[in-house]
C-alpha cells in the first residue's frame, strides 16, 4: 500500500512556476526574483497562483483512509510539542504521514501563507488501529530573516501577532489546530549582514507586487585573517617526529602536529590526492611521512560509485527525490547506513552525498540528486542520511553549497538573490543538517553566488558556515571547478578537488595550516 507524499508541487505547466519567467534570460546569471516564494510558498500565497496547481505539496494516495485528529500541544522554551492521533478508517493496512504547517502574521515582513515546520510517519496501521504521534516544532524555524531592517536588521525575528498551526496530510488537506499569539516582536537570533547581492533590482512580495532589495557596493573577495598556529617544529627534521597516531593518543595536539608540515607539504595536502583501489573520485590527505592516510572518496548519492570493470558490485538506491517522498527519516537513515557499509567494505572513507539543493525549478538538471522544494523537508531528510552514513566509519558530504539550481553553464552562472531568500530557503536545509547531524565534510558548488564563486566566498564559508553555525568539519570544492586555489583557501575552503593547484598558492602559512588542521581532524575521525 503506497504511503509516499509529493516533495514538490506539480503545477499545470512549466510556465506556472515563478522561476520559469527568467530561467532562459541569460547563460551567465539567474535572478531569483521570486525570493522566498518557492514551490508551494508561491502557489499558496501569491494571488491568482492557487489554481495553477495540479497536485499540491505533500499529496499522496493510499488504498485506505485515515482520520487525523489533533490532540493537544505543549509549549516549551524553544518550541512546541504536538500530539496527533492517526486512525486507519479503511479496510487495508497502511501508513500515513502527518504534516504540520504554520501561517505567520503578514506584518512588516511578508510571509508565505503556509510553511512546513514538522512531520512524522506512522507505523503500518491495521484497519481500525490508531497511533499517537508526537511531533516537535522549533520556534527558530518559524522565524523570518529581516534583511531590510523593518523590525531588526540582520536578525531572525518573530513578528507580533497570531501564528496559526495546521495539522493534516498535505499543504491543502489540513485543519486548524492551534493558535500561538505573540504580543510583541521578538528577535530570535541576531546576525550580521552577509552575501548581499549587487545586481538584484527587485523581489516578489506576498501580495504579488515587487519591492526593492538591499544591495551591497563594497569590495569583492574581502578575506579574513586566520589565527596564527604557533610555530613549533618549523617543518624541519627534529629528534622527535610526531605521527598522526601520536595526536590520536594525546601525545601532541593537532595544532602542533600540523606545524611539522613544510610549505610544500601544506600546498600538497590542500589538494586532492591520487586514486587507489577501486576509487575513481580521488582522495584527501596522503602525507605518508607523518602517517596521514589517503582518505578515498566515493561519489553518490544514489549509491557508492566506484571504478568500473573491477567486478565489485554496489547497490543502486532510489534517487534523493524519491527518498524525500517517503517522509520517513528512519528509513532514509537505514538506507544510508547500508550504503556506507558498502563504502567501508571497499575502503572508501568519504561518501560524496547527500545532495540537498532546493528544487527551485523543474528545469534544474540535478533535481534527481536533491530532495525537495521545501528547505525543512530537505534538511531533515539530509540529516537522516548523514546520521546513517556516519554510523559507519564513513564521512558524509552534503552538497552543493549553495544555490546550484541550473546545470547549463554551471561553472560560470551567477545565482543572484536576496540575503533573506538565501538564508530562509537555500541555506536552511544545510543549516538544519549541520545542527542536527554534524557532517564531517561539506562540498561547495560550481556556481557563482551574488558575484562571488561559492568556493571562494568567505562570507558564506567562514562567516555563515563556520562562524554562525559553528561548523568544524572539512570543506572541499566540487570537482574541476573554476575557482582560484589561493582564494578558496583564504575563504575557508580546505581541499581543492580532484587535485590542487600549488602554483596558485602563495606563502600564507596561517591559511594553509588552518586548512591542513581540518584535514588532520578528519583523519583523526577514522583513527
Q: Where on the chain are the PLM-derived regions?
A:
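Glycoside hydrolase catalytic-domain context in secreted enzymes
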Residues: 1-173, 193-527
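Short beta-strand elements
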Residues: 173-192
Amino acid at each position: 500500500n503506497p504511503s509516499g507524499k509529493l516533495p514538490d508541487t506539480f503545477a499545470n505547466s512549466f510556465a506556472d512556476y515563478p522561476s520559469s519567467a527568467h530561467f532562459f534570460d541569460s547563460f551567465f546569471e539567474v535572478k531569483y526574483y521570486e525570493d522566498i516564494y518557492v514551490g508551494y510558498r508561491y502557489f499558496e500565497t501569491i494571488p491568482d497562483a492557487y489554481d495553477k496547481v495540479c497536485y499540491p505539496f505533500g499529496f499522496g494516495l493510499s488504498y485506505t483512509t485515515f482520520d487525523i485528529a489533533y490532540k493537544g500541544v505543549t509549549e516549551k522554551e524553544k518550541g512546541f510539542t504536538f500530539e496527533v492521533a492517526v486512525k486507519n478508517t479503511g479496510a487495508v493496512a497502511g501508513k500515513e504521514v502527518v504534516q504540520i504547517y504554520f501561517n505567520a502574521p503578514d506584518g512588516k515582513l511578508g510571509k508565505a501563507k503556509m510553511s512546513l515546520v514538522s512531520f512524522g510517519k506512522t507505523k503500518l496501521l491495521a484497519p481500525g488501529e490508531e497511533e499517537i504521534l508526537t511531533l516537535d516544532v522549533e520556534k527558530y524555524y518559524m522565524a523570518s530573516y529581516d534583511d531590510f531592517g523593518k523590525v531588526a536588521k540582520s536578525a531572525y525575528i518573530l513578528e507580533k501577532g497570531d501564528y496559526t498551526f495546521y495539522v493534516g496530510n498535505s499543504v491543502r488537506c489540513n485543519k486548524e489546530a492551534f493558535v500561538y499569539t505573540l504580543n510583541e516582536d521578538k528577535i530570535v537570533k541576531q546576525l550580521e549582514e552577509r552575501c548581499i547581492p549587487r545586481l538584484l533590482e527587485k523581489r516578489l512580495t506576498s501580495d504579488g507586487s515587487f519591492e526593492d532589495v538591499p544591495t551591497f557596493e563594497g569590495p569583492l573577495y574581502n578575506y579574513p585573517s586566520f589565527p596564527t598556529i604557533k610555530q613549533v617544529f618549523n617543518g624541519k627534521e627534529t629528534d622527535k617526529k610526531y605521527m598522526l597516531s601520536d595526536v590520536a593518543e594525546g601525545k601532541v595536539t593537532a595544532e602542533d602536529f600540523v606545524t611539522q608540515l613544510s610549505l610544500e607539504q601544506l600546498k600538497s595536502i590542500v589538494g586532492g590526492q591520487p586514486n587507489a583501489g577501486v576509487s575513481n573520485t580521488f582522495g584527501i590527505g596522503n602525507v605518508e611521512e607523518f602517517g596521514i592516510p589517503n582518505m578515498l572518496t566515493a561519489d553518490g548519492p544514489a549509491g557508492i560509485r566506484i571504478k568500473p570493470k573491477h567486478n565489485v558490485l554496489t547497490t543502486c538506491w532510489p534517487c534523493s527525490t524519491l527518498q524525500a517522498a517517503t517522509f520517513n527519516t528512519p528509513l532514509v537513515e537505514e538506507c544510508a547506513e547500508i550504503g556506507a557499509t558498502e563504502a567501508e567494505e571497499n575502503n572508501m572513507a568519504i561518501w560524496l552525498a547527500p545532495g540537498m539543493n532546493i528544487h527551485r525549478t523543474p528545469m534544474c538538471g540535478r533535481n534527481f540528486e536533491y530532495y525537495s522544494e521545501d528547505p525543512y523537508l530537505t534538511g531533515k531528510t539530509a540529516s537522516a542520511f548523514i546520521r546513517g552514513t556516519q554510523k559507519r566509519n564513513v564521512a558524509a558530504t552534503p552538497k552543493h553549497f549553495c544555490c546550484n539550481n541550473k546545470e547549463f553553464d554551471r561553472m560560470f552562472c551567477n545565482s543572484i538573490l536576496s540575503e533573506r531568500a538565501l538564508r530562509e530557503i537555500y541555506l536552511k536545509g544545510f543549516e538544519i543538517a549541520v545542527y542536527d547531524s554534524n557532517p564531517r565534510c561539506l562540498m561547495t558548488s560550481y556556481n557563482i553566488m551574488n558575484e562571488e564563486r561559492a568556493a571562494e566566498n568567505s562570507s558564506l564559508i567562514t562567516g555563515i558556515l563556520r562562524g554562525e553555525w559553528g561548523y568544524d568539519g572539512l570543506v572541499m570544492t566540487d570537482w574541476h571547478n573554476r575557482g582560484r586555489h589561493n582564494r578558496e583557501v583564504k575563504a575557508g575552503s580546505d581541499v581543492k578537488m580532484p587535485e590542487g593547484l600549488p602554483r596558485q598558492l602563495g606563502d600564507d602559512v596561517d591559511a594553509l595550516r588552518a586548512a591542513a588542521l581540518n584535514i588532520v581532524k578528519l583523519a583523526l575521525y577514522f583513527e
